[in-house]
């Protein structure tokens, strides 16, 4: 699991920013304060590792994330034409650190090229590796890259994006080994190709989160798969998703992706609360915490919901997860430092109490109540 992310001159982070990560980490704060940039840095590495089994070239446009040109990700006030992304991680047997410096590519504006890499405090520039080293030294560098736990762990990431789609009634059949995309596509193919237990687990989970659900898959056609659902459990009548509450189809990809996430993997989720009643948001967080504990699943969640935060607090209070395995990161901005984000770690104690309540953190209801009482 990742324990730290370090950014420098990447997007809004002009100076080096160390971002602690726990088994369950919630990124919280006003819009435009750097939360998405944190996720995007990790997802860029994931995208390059997933598609090329390497991070020597960082592809800024791909099937996971699209950030545009190199100049779009380099901090606007950068003193050098480079940015760096660092990671720290641990497994049962070892800890690992990785820091990569990237600069612009000569041949394309949509790729960042590795300039220097530091693995477990041992540095080697990419240019030296390719121009000045012997073949034996070059092989050692390649080996050290392939042995990096932090790099290999990138392959364990699953991502559900903020701009995900609600499930459609019909999907073209794509065959085996289909994955759910960041936008939530292919979920019907995954349900159809998996064991019947997965469909039942998804139905039970949806029912618990949304206070009732029935799911049925029509898997008999050769070229397509259909889904029907209802907002009542064990319903004899099911309907196209468009004719049931939108939240049902919208949340399905997240629920299924969580259920199929392998042991010890990583799930990155943006705005899980979207289109859900506050009570459903709380129960969704209970579901996510349960899955995290059962499978040692690392959750990195960006959210604007007090109910998501409180869901983690309640889980700690009920001793479903240790307080040491959770953290809340509050993102704010100091106008005196020209918009540089500030990241404050808020701790949850054993009783679910929070270590601090900074401005704009879970205080909107209090602000509104004060106006109502004037």
Regions found by a protein language model. Give the residues of each.
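C-terminal lobe/lid and adjacent interdomain/linker elements of RecA-like ASCE P-loop ATPase modules
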Residues: 77, 283-374
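Walker B catalytic acidic pair
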Residues: 270-271
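Phosphate-coordinating catalytic segments in nucleotide- and nucleic-acid-processing enzymes
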Residues: 4-6, 48-252, 257, 262, ...
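Phosphate-binding P-loop
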Residues: 16-22, 258-263, 290-294
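Pre-Walker A-like glycine/lysine-rich segment at the N-terminus of P-loop NTPase domains
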Residues: 1-50, 54-59
